[in-house]
Amino acid sequence: MTRDVGGLIRVAEERDAPAIAGIYAPAITDGVISFELTPPDAQEMLRRIVAIQQQYPWLVYEESETVLGYVYASVHNERAAYRWSVDVTAYIRHDAHRRGIGRALYTALFEILVLQGYRTACAGVTLPNTASVQMHAAMGFKEVGVYHDVGYKFGKWHDVGWYERSLAAHVLEPPEPVPFPELAGTTHVKAAFARAAGLIKST
């Protein structure tokens, strides 16, 4: 397998909303990866993308003009003291697994979050999900606990494991996180995209 697959990681755009909604829908309808019950349509997905991108990155991996996966960061908790921590989420199209797309998207996302000044990334995984747990471990996440029977879906109660990854040193008096739009077009972000895309395997 070669690394030159001709794909790219970039900032999500309005035109990506239908593809992103399509990637996300099976996580709702076909299992318990997501605790949502009704898949959002493209319009609702666009609303979410726009809202997230006011502060955080929302990225996609595109190959042959087709979006195969996406990743984004979001607020971990609304209380002010949490503002240096984020939740991170990634979804890959069902036929594009095992190519390293999720890891590449996370790699790009983490570089940008560091540039913004964030210190900790958190991720929740509905259990059991061996593939997701292993991927997060490979990306440097450590398990910090399990919420038992915290979600009820499809007639069953489900556990959620929580994982954290340090992004940067937890210094005293940290500067305020930089909003993503202030960094989106910089050479540092473009370089992060290129480096991460080089990790993806061909089919």
Language model feature labels by segment:
Residues A21-R48:
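Conserved GNAT-fold acetyl-CoA-binding loop/helix
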Residues Y72, C122-V125, A137, K142-D159, ...:
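Conserved catalytic-core motifs of GNAT/GCN5-like acyltransferases
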Residues A169-T203:
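Acidic/histidine-enriched, glycine/proline-rich intrinsically disordered or flexible terminal extensions
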Residues T66-Y70, A131, W157:
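Glycine-rich acetyl-CoA-binding "A-motif" of GNAT/NAT acetyltransferases
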Residues R98-E111, A131-A138:
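Conserved acetyl-CoA-binding loop-helix of GNAT-fold acetyltransferases
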